[in-house]
Amino acid sequence: MLSAFFKTAHCALRNMPIQTDLVGKWNFVSSENFDEYLKEVGVGWAIRTIATKTKPALEFAVNGDEWTMNSNSTFKNYTLKWKLGTASDEKTADGRDVSSVFSIENDHLVQIETGKGGGKDSRIERYIENGKLVIVCTCNGVKCTRVYEKAA
């Protein structure tokens, strides 16, 4: 019984760093292969053109078991709320309808988007590397990487 408690406590503590490190404001630094990723998930030319020129600022917050991500840019302001392990329907910033489930795997915040109405599935991983927020989006083998730095 006691060993089960320590195993659970260890897992909970192991999952905390991404939660604490992610909280706060992040400024856009760079993007690689974003247009190809957006094309693969089915985003049209006009939205892709705008989205690839946009440099959103992100802000993450955690309140109890609810997470929030705000994305603010000249193109669009977007808020996403979730609880780990719970599926939630959302309309993505680029207009796709998906069902998302978030989890923590190896200190990465992982979002699995399941496309609705014929939409494509996607995997989005967010993690901290060398003090920067790295976001890797993958759909059908097409991968993009976006990098942010913590706001002062």
From Swiss-Prot:
The keyword Transport applies. It comes from the Eukaryota. Keywords: Lipid-binding, Transport. One of its GO terms (cellular component) is nucleus. InterPro entries: Calycin, Fatty_acid-bd, ILBP, Lipocln_cytosolic_FA-bd_dom. GO terms for molecular function: fatty acid binding. GO terms for biological process: fatty acid transport. PANTHER family: FATTY ACID BINDING PROTEIN (PTHR11955). Belongs to the calycin superfamily. Fatty-acid binding protein (FABP) family. This is Fatty acid-binding protein homolog 9.
